[in-house]
Amino acid sequence: MTTIVSVRRGNQVVVGGDGQVSLGNTVMKGNARKVHRLYNNQVIAGFAGGTADAFTLLERFEAKLQAHQGNLERAAVELAKDWRTDRSLRRLEALLAVADKNSSYIITGNGDVVRPENDLMAIGSGGYFAQSAAIALLENTDLDAKTIVEKALAIAGNICVFTNETHTIECIDFSDEITTESKK
């Protein structure tokens, strides 16, 4: 279980996630990296769900991005098509949250592709907590996207036992600056 949250505001899109890997009620690892850059650093993907399943989907999504020259929407739709038709994929229990400088999508375990309202995405066991925090911060502050993601992850980590305080945060600045941050 995990928390992944993405916020788009101003000239940035930011995706952040915690680092906890749990097996049942036991914490197995505290510094896993669940947010990755893909396609020449132009796409950020975060995953939630079973680790092996999530990595399988991430690899397949990256292959779709390569096949479609980084077209995020096309890659997401093609992965969803595969997900629905490939028996081995249908058994995978994972979610992907993907974003580039133009759009954001959640790819669900049912093979659905959802473009979230207001380009705010949150998935995983702490997703609802992070989403609620991010909505409140977006509507009531002028904080930048990165700060909102940091605060939303911190709030989710204080509520959800399957989310920790070790975060990986990736940012695409539309002026083409790339920022990566891991912190505890």
Curated annotation (Swiss-Prot):
Keyword Lyase: no
A GO-annotated cellular component: proteasome core complex
Keywords of the record: Allosteric enzyme, Cytoplasm, Hydrolase, Metal-binding, Protease, Sodium, Threonine protease
Subcellular location: Cytoplasm
Source domain of life: Bacteria
Matching InterPro entries: ATP-dep_Prtase_HsIV_su, Ntn_hydrolases_N, Proteasome_sua/b, Proteasome_suB-type
Disulfide-bonded cysteines: none
E.C. code: 3.4.25.2
Signal peptide from the UniProt entry: none
Organism of this sequence: Psychromonas ingrahamii (strain DSM 17664 / CCUG 51855 / 37)
Inhibition and activation profile: Allosterically activated by HslU binding.
Family classification: Belongs to the peptidase T1B family. HslV subfamily.
Subunit structure: A double ring-shaped homohexamer of HslV is capped on each side by a ring-shaped HslU homohexamer. The assembly of the HslU/HslV complex is dependent on binding of ATP.
Entry annotation: catalytic residues: 2
Record-given protein name: ATP-dependent protease subunit HslV
Catalytic activity, as annotated: ATP-dependent cleavage of peptide bonds with broad specificity
Record-level GO BP terms: proteolysis involved in protein catabolic process
Binding site for Na(+): 157, 160, 163
Function (record text): Protease subunit of a proteasome-like degradation complex believed to be a general protein degrading machinery.
PANTHER family: ATP-DEPENDENT PROTEASE SUBUNIT HSLV, METALLOPROTEASE TLDD
GO MF terms held by the record: metal ion binding; threonine-type endopeptidase activity
Cross-referenced HAMAP family: HslV (MF_00248)
